């Protein structure tokens, strides 16, 4: 029986073609929860006016069809208009409308059933992968991979776009004059003229962080300039003197105008580090602005193009290491398209910020770019001799622990870093029950084993893992001291701070100039994540001359937020009276442990009966509080403060 559904009322001009019926579509298309979501996104009244078809049956494009929405890989492969020599996947084409030879607009998105499923139930292999992409600087400029958990969000956005195009049509693209390899005098004059405008800026670089080309456009102009810096033969495009004048003019333009970039933290860092261009005071980063609107959604330039613009996907056209003049021209054209799309996205984002009420939040994020980039460039000084000594000591300790493990397990070839060997030893040879089959050898699983089984080898394995992790975290390239004129004084830790790194707006950090492509040094980069350094590692930080190091932290920040999201009760009273929630929970959950270690055990019961205000005033509270906090350094099975902390976190996150 055919599953296609024709409109029952006046046709709105929108045809939807599913790649294949879902496992629930036995009698009609879009059944079950996926069908409910689709109807909700499109609106029940509109569903009656569309043509709904499936690619596994003969498809009929009705007269007066304006838009065809292709849902699923099969529909895209069969019907999406492909440009010659540019194979297109669903991930690349999603949300980017294309005009077919029949004059109909084609746009594609995820199949509703795939978007509704938390994993791939439709394929025989049933892949569990969420499809999360890495958050490195190379992915934020491309379309990137879309996380499966966000497929519903993007499907909804694409459905709205398809219906809008069916109703209003696709407006002609704004016409820009993209000047590739322009006259350098014209470029310099153009940069020095504007004041108080938006300067749309994008750079392309090699794996060594040297410029390949610079693209820019001013908000009052339709001229887009793509200025080549180096040719594919690694020679300057212009003379040394003209290149200096261009950098000077670019510096002036960035100081006089508001710089708009996508992922400005990378572009501005390269310009400051390699070409000594001061960090501009006024910056608007479209990636940060989008992140403040929708924190959990992908933020690559390709994703934003699919949301705001009606342009074909071009992010696969970039050639970052051209080897001939043709590839070089392709890179320059790609850079020009990035400038044009960044400008269109920036205009759309202004309205989106108002719609979501995130203007102040985005303004704060943009204002933080300059100080965090300054922190990246300065780095944190370290005692290099102490740094090297600590690394050597950690490696020596790890090797000594591994020798002890080899002796105690009677396995000279025991490799603690091999989860297969550790799994075989613990669960096959020692016949221990595995608390977590999915993660049989991670630290939490081994700690759970220790609470029930007093096996010395587990303690040694944990110590070896921890020591190895600490030593591995020190396998970094130290950053140059840019405050001196010396070019070989590499004595500083550094990191790239990622303001858009987390869904909760918490600051992220990572190594800088770290590439998957390039030489061995390029794959290491400089620095490391400085957000979660162990106390032992932080002792290696030293202050610069005339300065002092300080530590600023909002203790228990997440618990504090939860306390104020809830109604006013005892949980909030803990913070109002300066009592850590971890201490309070530990006091009640492990009171028998405190009784064994205190001179006056009866006071523990008395403390448990008090409310937060009374607890703070009790004469014995300080003594018990200190004991609870000290338990964090006790043996693994007795780290009661740590366990109480985990209980609090689990409660706060509704686990």
Question: Which positions does each model-derived feature cover?
Answer:
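Conserved "right-hand" nucleotidyltransferase catalytic core of DNA-directed polymerases
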Residues: 161-235, 296, 308-309, 313-316, ...
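Acidic beta-strand-to-loop metal/phosphate-binding motif
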Residues: 66-73, 200, 257-267, 549-551
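Short, amphipathic alpha-helical "recognition" segments used to contact nucleic acids or chromatin
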Residues: 641-653
């Amino acid at each position: 029986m055919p599953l296609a559904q024709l409109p029952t009322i006046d046709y709105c001009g929108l045809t939807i073609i599913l790649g294949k019926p879902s496992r629930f579509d036995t009698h009609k298309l879009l059944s079950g929860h996926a069908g409910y979501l689709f109807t909700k996104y499109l609106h029940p009244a509109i569903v009656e006016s569309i043509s709904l078809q499936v690619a596994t049956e003969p498809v009929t494009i009705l007269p007066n069809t304006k838009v065809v929405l292709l849902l699923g890989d099969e529909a895209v492969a069969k019907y999406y208009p492909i440009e010659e020599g540019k194979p297109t996947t669903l991930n690349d084409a999603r949300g980017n409308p294309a005009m077919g030879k029949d004059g109909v607009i084609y746009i594609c998105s995820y199949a509703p059933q795939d978007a509704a499923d938390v994993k791939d139930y439709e394929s025989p292999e049933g892949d569990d992968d969420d499809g999360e992409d890495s958050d490195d600087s190379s992915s934020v400029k491309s379309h990137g991979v879309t996380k499966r958990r966000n497929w519903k969000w993007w499907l909804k956005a694409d459905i709205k776009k398809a219906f809008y195009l069916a109703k209003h049509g696709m407006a002609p693209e704004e016409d820009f004059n993209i000047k590739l390899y322009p006259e350098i005098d014209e470029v310099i004059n153009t940069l020095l003229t504007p004041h108080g405008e938006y300067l749309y800026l994008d750079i392309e670089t090699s794996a060594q962080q040297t410029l390949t080309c610079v693209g820019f456009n001013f908000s009052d102009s339709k001229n887009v300039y793509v200025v080549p810096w180096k040719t594919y033969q690694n020679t300057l495009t212009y003379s040394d003197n003209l290149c200096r004048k261009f950098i000077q003019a670019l510096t002036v333009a960035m100081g006089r105008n508001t710089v708009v970039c996508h992922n400005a933290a990378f572009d501005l860092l390269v310009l400051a580090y390699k070409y000594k261009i001061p960090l501009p005071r006024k910056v608007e980063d479209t990636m940060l602005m989008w992140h403040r609107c929708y924190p959990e959604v992908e933020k690559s330039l390709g994703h934003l193009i699919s949301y705001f613009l009606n342009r074909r996907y071009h992010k696969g056209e970039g050639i970052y290491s051209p080897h001939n003049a043709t590839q070089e021209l392709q890179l320059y054209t790609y850079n020009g398209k990035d400038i044009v799309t960044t400008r269109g996205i920036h205009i759309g984002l202004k309205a989106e910020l108002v719609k979501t009420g995130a203007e102040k939040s985005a303004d704060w994020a943009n204002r933080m770019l300059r100080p965090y980039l300054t922190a990246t460039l300065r780095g944190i000084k370290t005692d290099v001799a102490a740094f090297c000594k600590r690394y050597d000591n950690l490696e020596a300790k790890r090797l000594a622990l591994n020798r002890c493990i080899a002796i105690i397990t009677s396995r000279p070839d025991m490799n603690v870093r091999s989860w297969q060997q550790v799994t075989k030893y613990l669960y096959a040879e020692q016949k221990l029950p595995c608390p977590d089959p999915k993660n049989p050898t991670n630290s939490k699983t081994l700690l759970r084993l220790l609470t029930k089984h007093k096996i010395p080898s587990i303690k040694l394995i944990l110590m070896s893992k921890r020591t190895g992790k600490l030593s591995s975290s020190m396998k970094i390239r130290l950053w140059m001291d840019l405050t001196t004129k010396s070019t070989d004084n590499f004595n500083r830790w550094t990191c790239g701070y990622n303001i858009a790194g987390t869904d909760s707006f918490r600051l992220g950090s990572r190594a800088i100039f770290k590439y998957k492509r390039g030489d061995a040094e390029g794959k290491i980069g400089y620095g490391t994540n400085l957000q979660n350094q162990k106390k032992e590692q932080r002792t290696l930080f030293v202050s610069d001359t005339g300065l002092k190091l300080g530590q600023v932290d909002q203790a228990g920040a997440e618990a504090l937020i939860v306390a104020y999201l809830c109604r006013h009760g005892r949980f909030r009273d803990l913070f109002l009276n300066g009592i850590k929630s971890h201490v309070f929970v530990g006091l009640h959950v492990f009171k028998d442990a405190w009784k064994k270690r205190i001179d006056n055990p009866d006071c523990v019961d008395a403390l448990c009966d008090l409310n937060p205000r009374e607890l703070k005033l009790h004469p014995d509270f300080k003594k018990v509080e200190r004991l609870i906090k000290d338990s964090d350094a006790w043996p693994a099975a007795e780290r009661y403060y740590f366990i109480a902390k985990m209980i609090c976190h689990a409660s706060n996150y509704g686990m």
